[in-house]
UniProtKB/Swiss-Prot annotation:
Primary gene name: rpo10
Keyword Transferase belongs to the record: yes
Name assigned to this protein: DNA-directed RNA polymerase subunit Rpo10
PANTHER family xref list: DNA-DIRECTED RNA POLYMERASES I, II, AND III SUBUNIT RPABC5, DNA-DIRECTED RNA POLYMERASES I, II, AND III SUBUNIT RPABC5 FAMILY MEMBER
Catalytically driven reaction(s): RNA(n) + a ribonucleoside 5'-triphosphate = RNA(n+1) + diphosphate
Keywords: Cytoplasm, DNA-directed RNA polymerase, Metal-binding, Nucleotidyltransferase, Transcription, Transferase, Zinc
One GO location term (cellular component): cytoplasm
Length: 73
């Protein structure tokens, strides 16, 4: 699944800050502090970031799905 453009619950646009969130998380910053700095205050929006899987190498789950599909074509 790709990162959603909007929060599933409230509809706020959240994708505009995802790349910065991802970069800072990969640098080792605390997700709580990053979300606070980015202005993501609502818990429904915060859970969209926290629950989205980003591997230690920066790969997202969609990258793994695509690689899996290509092996079996």
């Amino acid at each position: 699944m790709m990162f959603p453009i909007r929060c599933f619950s409230c509809g706020n646009v959240i994708a505009e800050v995802f790349e910065e969130y991802k970069e800072r998380i990969l640098k080792g910053e605390n997700p709580k502090d990053v979300l606070d700095d980015l202005g993501i205050k609502k818990y429904c929006c915060r859970r969209m970031f926290i629950s989205y899987r980003i591997g230690e190498d920066g790969r997202e789950i969609i990258d793994e799905i695509i690689a899996h599909d290509e092996r079996y074509l």
